[in-house]
Design a protein with these regions (language model features):
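Soluble extracytoplasmic domains of inner/organellar membrane proteins
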Residues: 114-190, 194
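N-terminal beta-strand/beta-hairpin edge segment
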Residues: 40-133, 137-150
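Hydrophobic membrane-insertion alpha-helices, especially the h-region
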Residues: 4-20
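Extracytoplasmic/luminal low-complexity segments enriched in Pro/Gly and acidic/polar residues
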Residues: 184-230
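N-terminal amphipathic/hydrophobic interface segments
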Residues: 16-50
């Protein structure tokens, strides 16, 4: 019995030490690895849980992370900031499948900043008739100029739009489409461009809601938060 008690006491010490040293380092490295796998070119994370052994059950008391190049659906975020408190992850999915599923959180917010270059890349990928795309951003929205061949003639295109939210998705929505220097009469703009789905919220690793989309000079800021706080 005495040997068993000594063994159990030693095991408890090992678990306690691992919980305060090995597990936090492993969790930190895993978080940064997952951010890189999600497209981040640079990533920094800080997380804290006490006692540390609770990390084995997916419990994170506080987390903050910043990343460059993280992808939100079809958009590259030039900067992404994540803040969370009392976050509970699906531990089996994290450890066995390396997938992040948020079960609950007292607070979990993501702020992403989108540049003109990111929106230019979005338009270039989804509108194959447009060339030489240039994009500018201000408080009114997205302003783009481009060129396109329409009915064999080169035309100058002026396109405007906004990133808009719906209850279950984020879109790029066109608000203006002008064609200049094209002697073919009125064009059907639906043939050349339509709304672009950026992401469905159901595709994100947490049940999220879009809090706001703010168009600024030189950037668009998108804010999301966990939809089912405890």
């Amino acid at each position: 019995m005495r040997k068993l008690l000594i063994f159990l006491a030693g095991l408890a010490v090992v678990i306690a030490v691992a919980g305060e040293t090995i597990l936090p380092r492993w969790a930190h490295d895993t978080a940064e690895t997952l951010l890189h796998e999600a497209g981040a070119e640079e990533a920094e994370t800080m997380l804290h849980t006490s006692p540390g052994v609770l990390l084995l059950f997916g419990q994170i008391d506080d987390i903050s992370a910043s990343a460059k190049g993280l992808r939100l659906g079809q958009l590259r975020l030039d900067r992404a900031e994540l803040r969370g408190a009392d976050v509970r992850l699906d531990a089996p999915a994290l450890f066995l499948d390396r997938k992040v599923h948020v079960k609950s959180a007292e607070e979990l917010k993501l702020t992403g900043t989108v540049s003109a270059e990111s929106l230019r890349d979005l338009l270039a990928r989804h509108v194959d008739k447009l060339d030489n795309i240039e994009v500018a951003l201000d408080e009114e929205g997205v302003h783009a100029t481009a060129q396109a061949k329409i009915f064999g003639r080169k035309a100058d295109i002026l396109l405007e739009g906004k990133i808009v939210e719906e209850p279950d998705a984020l879109f790029f929505h066109m608000t203006r489409f002008d064609i200049k220097n094209a002697a073919f009469g009125k064009a059907n703009i639906g043939d050349f461009f339509g709304d672009i789905l950026i992401t469905k919220l159901s595709a994100l690793p947490l049940k999220a809601q879009i809090d706001s989309v703010e168009h600024r000079d030189g950037a668009v800021v998108v804010r999301l938060s966990c939809r089912n706080p405890r």
